[in-house]
């Protein structure tokens, strides 16, 4: 079954985030071209994205994974720095650094070769973490799904580099 913007908005409501009808229409549904959006994908709403800063609300459904990627330098800028703040549910963020011996979640088995960073950061509501520019990372929601506020420098998603060559 396909994902609807109304379903995404129900997660925002669980987190106490109110979007207008026009904003709900602007929710973006991403499957990264892999065709398995409930397993690998991301839903988001962009409040603002200027040449100085960006603010988004991300939704991940239960067990849904945003694939490994990094935000490289672009046009003389060092790459996007982003802070994630968990608003609802639980999100497991994996970044460069010392490998977590027993990660709490794993990416989809069929895609595992495209995941190379394993330093685990567990975010619950109120928890936040800042990802430095040009740092490989991926994340997955826990059993309830997750809502995450992203605050960052300018977002130029078309320049993101994914570890998976299919994306």
Curated annotation (Swiss-Prot):
Gene Ontology terms, MF aspect: D-lyxose ketol-isomerase activity; metal ion binding
Catalytic activity: D-lyxose = D-xylulose
Statement: the UniProt record of this protein carries the keyword Metal-binding: yes
Native organism taxonomy: Bacteria, Bacillati, Bacillota, Bacilli, Bacillales
Cofactors named for this entry: Mn(2+)
Quaternary structure and partners: Homodimer.
Name this polypeptide is given: Probable D-lyxose ketol-isomerase
Known role: Sugar isomerase that catalyzes the reversible isomerization of D-lyxose to D-xylulose.
Keyword line: Carbohydrate metabolism, Isomerase, Manganese, Metal-binding
Family named by the database record: Belongs to the D-lyxose ketol-isomerase family.
Principal EC category: isomerase
Keyword Cytoplasm: no
UniProt: Mn(2+) binding residues: 69, 71, 82, 137
Enzyme Commission no: 5.3.1.15
């Amino acid at each position: 079954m396909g994902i609807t913007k109304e379903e995404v908005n129900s997660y925002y409501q669980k987190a106490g985030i109110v979007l207008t009808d026009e904003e709900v229409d602007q929710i973006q549904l991403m499957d990264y071209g892999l065709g398995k959006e409930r397993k690998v994908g991301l839903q988001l709403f962009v409040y603002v994205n200027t040449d100085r800063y960006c603010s988004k609300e991300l939704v991940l459904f239960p067990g849904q994974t945003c694939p490994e990627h990094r935000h490289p330098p672009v046009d003389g800028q060092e790459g996007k720095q982003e802070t994630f703040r968990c608003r609802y549910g639980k999100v497991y963020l994996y970044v460069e650094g010392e490998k977590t011996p027993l990660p709490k979640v794993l990416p989809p088995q069929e895609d595992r070769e495209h995941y190379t960073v394993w330093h685990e950061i567990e975010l619950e509501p109120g928890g936040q973490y800042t990802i430095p520019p040009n740092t490989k990372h991926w994340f997955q929601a826990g059993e309830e799904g997750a809502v995450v506020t992203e605050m960052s420098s300018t977002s130029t998603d078309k320049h993101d580099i994914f570890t998976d060559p299919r994306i």
